[in-house]
Amino acid sequence: AQYGRELLSCVPENPDQSILDLGCGTGTLTHALLEKSASVTGLDSSPEMIAKARQLYPGMDFRVLDARLMPWRNRFDIVFSNAALHWIPDHGTLLNAVSRVLKPQGKLVCEFGARLNILRIREAFRTALERRSLPYTTRFYFPAAEEYGSVLEQAGLRPETMKEFDRPTPLKGGPDGLRNWACQFFREDLNNLHEEQRIQIFKEMEDSLKDELWDGSQWVADYRRIRVTAAR
């Protein structure tokens, strides 16, 4: 959420506008968006995340919903999203839904993983799986800016700004930071493995990444981001 506050600067202030926070998680940035507008809705596909958001920010409008199935039409002036859209592989369907819920001249303001995002970590994980003859499935969408411009246009959205940039990001947890992060990010691949297998995979990842991503006190993930604003 601390990095998401940079993205907030791309959202204009207007008390009369309506904002949708897509992939809102536990609602930290949804609540911060009240500085920009009095009408803010948070949406996430995780019931657990939304339950926490409602607990933290009672009285705010939070919905459990798949972003590709949003029911509204011409409803929001701004669709905002931070660090969420890479979890949705099918951006054609997603952006058609975003275009549908935006009002005419409404804007998409988003940031998520770009091409080469966590490349070193993904390759270390893939290698550890392949060593055990286990398949690695790409479950994320990390586009390049030039590629994403075409995807936006096909959904009826006009790109205004697109920027790719590196964002080395410290992982919480000290020596356990990488494996804690991997448990979350690669959970679908790890869920079917025995605990001993998971521990061995984490150890191999740590050994192969230590020279590049361990700074002596914490793991620093090789994040790369794309920041986009587009208009309907």
PLM region descriptions:
Residues L20-L69:
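Class I SAM-dependent methyltransferase SAM/SAH-binding core
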Residues E160-D215:
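C-terminal helical/coil "lid" or tail adjacent to the Rossmann-like core of SAM-dependent
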Residues I78-H91:
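A short SAM/SAH-binding and catalytic strip from SAM-dependent methyltransferases
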Residues Y141-A155:
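Short alpha-helix
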Residues K107-R131:
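Conserved class I S-adenosyl-L-methionine
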Residues R68-V79:
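A short acidic, Gly/Pro-enriched loop at the edge of an enzyme's catalytic core
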